[in-house]
């Protein structure tokens, strides 16, 4: 039956083939371009502000941007602060 379907099926037009290929390319680029160009500078600026108040290692700050449903972006900022020094009387 599959052999009969193969010979009787219509060939896809070149426009449809090109459209499918373009959709694959666009989907791949969206996955690979997940990080916006401004994110490293944003991380640096946030780190500078935090360092004005607390002495921390730059590796203790993580910034992630997550895309949800195409039009919603979530910026997640995690800062591991050092333990507070006990004040002596």
Swiss-Prot record:
Stored Pfam families: MinE
Entries under InterPro entries matching the protein: MinE, MinE_sf
Function statement: Prevents the cell division inhibition by proteins MinC and MinD at internal division sites while permitting inhibition at polar sites. This ensures cell division at the proper site by restricting the formation of a division septum at the midpoint of the long axis of the cell.
GO BP terms, alphabetized: cell division; regulation of division septum assembly
Family: Belongs to the MinE family.
Keywords, alphabetical: Cell cycle, Cell division
Lineage: Bacteria, Pseudomonadati, Pseudomonadota, Gammaproteobacteria, Enterobacterales
Top-level taxon of origin: Bacteria
Lipid metabolism keyword on record: no
Name of the protein in its database record: Cell division topological specificity factor
């Amino acid at each position: 039956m599959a052999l009969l379907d193969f010979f009787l099926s219509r060939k896809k037009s070149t426009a449809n083939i090109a459209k499918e290929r373009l959709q694959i390319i666009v989907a791949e680029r969206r996955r690979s371009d997940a990080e916006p160009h401004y994110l490293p500078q944003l991380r640096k600026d946030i780190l500078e502000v935090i360092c004005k108040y607390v002495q921390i290692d730059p590796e203790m700050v993580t910034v992630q941007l997550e895309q949800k449903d195409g039009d919603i972006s979530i910026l997640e900022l995690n800062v591991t602060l050092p333990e507070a020094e006990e004040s002596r009387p």
